[in-house]
């Protein structure tokens, strides 16, 4: 097998590495740099990539930056002249450039690659990344998470067993914290958390805003609308940020930045590290949320962490390093170049695929929960977030109406308990279900997530063996903002969600109780005196009235009354018939109290009401 290169396709910068012997090595670009700006420009019919494109990013309107933030975003396109490009196509230009100079370095054709993505990338974004690789002529052998890749680079030659490692990854446009366990060649991700709209660009912007404000106060000129000035300010802000990682103060000089009534105007400013820390303190503190959540999701405290790894160029900022040290209670490991660790780790994974690296197993996780919509609009999870991948999970569901000929499977991703608040990944239909009473058909829904975090869903009628499958397409994925909003909303609306979930559960229980009680009364008709069933019938009528009036308090009260009446009837039937008929009668009215709950035995049915979930699948008219 030919060499498998490892690519860190970053928001701001990208890097590439390859395994030489047993060691990963960064491949420099034609300019001799170890990282390449993730910038694409169109000028005079020529496509420019990297440093040359970055230098004229603001002055040339046909320059695309940070395209990674739009990967997997449905309908998003960049218009250049009379042509439109998808994020996959723009990313492919970057990958093609990387592929070309990698081939020049290796002296052979490159066809295979491992590409990294932020840990919080969803299915759609991962699919889009694979598509970009295909467009660039690369066979993407594996998609792995950036923090996981950096841990691979750190742990390749480590012999310690059962190390728990926290990876703090602050890049140019994204931020992640991951907790991994390393031991005996196994790299297992325990949890991941992050903010996909936070990175070094935000720190640069704070310096730019400060310079613009000061210049406006001193000269009465607003530079924020001057494209030429903004390009120079952006470059100066990035340089000042980097300088302040090594010195306590830096001088910013931008002569002839603008012009006033008296002639040319020059920008001169001194920025101290203390002032920079003040301007960006809230950004640093914002990362603490993901830091704490990652530990909590892994069921750990900082005392359980053996090593802390800093990843991403923005972790060179002294205030960031100090904050992580204070939070973790230990000095971060500085043995890996934070700009290069991800690409190095990807190259190691490439070595695993090609067979050059032995005895390493990578176990990653899925960042968001996956499931389907069930009765009452509830989001029923089949795979929880932070589940190790690859994985597969099956669960039995049933129909919501008698003689229902088809089910519509609504696939969702998110953390909210109600389907309407989560993100639709796809829908598909399972048809030709034989006529049967509600709750009788057994529909097995299976979720499969492969090693790249890409989702496949199937639904199978266990009675007929008929099956329908779907692979979630990238056009239906989530944006970075939607992922962040999902978890934020889940925290802010926890109480509201709980109340809505309880209401839906009550309605489901009432509906099921009415259904089975009516069935029981019909089965006992003519077999027992009406005086024996009058209390049940009266309680049933009262519950149906409360349901019609949509009175939740009344529904709860009348449901309990009907359950008690049904229980009393079951006892009488048991006494009259020696137990056999009574047992059946008891199972009928009581079963609904447990109905509509997920079955956790992956399809085993013990005949009780709690063995399947009412799917509330949409009824399909076979004549349409």
From Swiss-Prot:
One of its GO terms (molecular function) is ATP binding. Residues 470-504, 577-624 are annotated as: Disordered. Keywords: ATP-binding, Chaperone, Nucleotide-binding, Phosphoprotein, Stress response. The modification Phosphothreonine is found at residue 174. Residues 481-504, 615-624 have a biased composition (Basic and acidic residues). It comes from Lactobacillus johnsonii (strain CNCM I-12250 / La1 / NCC 533). Induction: By stress conditions e.g. heat shock. Pfam families: HSP70. The gene is dnaK. InterPro entries: ATPase_NBD, Chaperone_DnaK, Heat_shock_70_CS, HSP70_C_sf, HSP70_peptide-bd_sf, Hsp_70_fam. Residues 577-605 have a biased composition (Low complexity). Acts as a chaperone. Belongs to the heat shock protein 70 family. PANTHER family: HEAT SHOCK PROTEIN 70KDA (PTHR19375). It comes from the Bacteria. This is Chaperone protein DnaK. CDD domains: ASKHA_NBD_HSP70_DnaK-like.
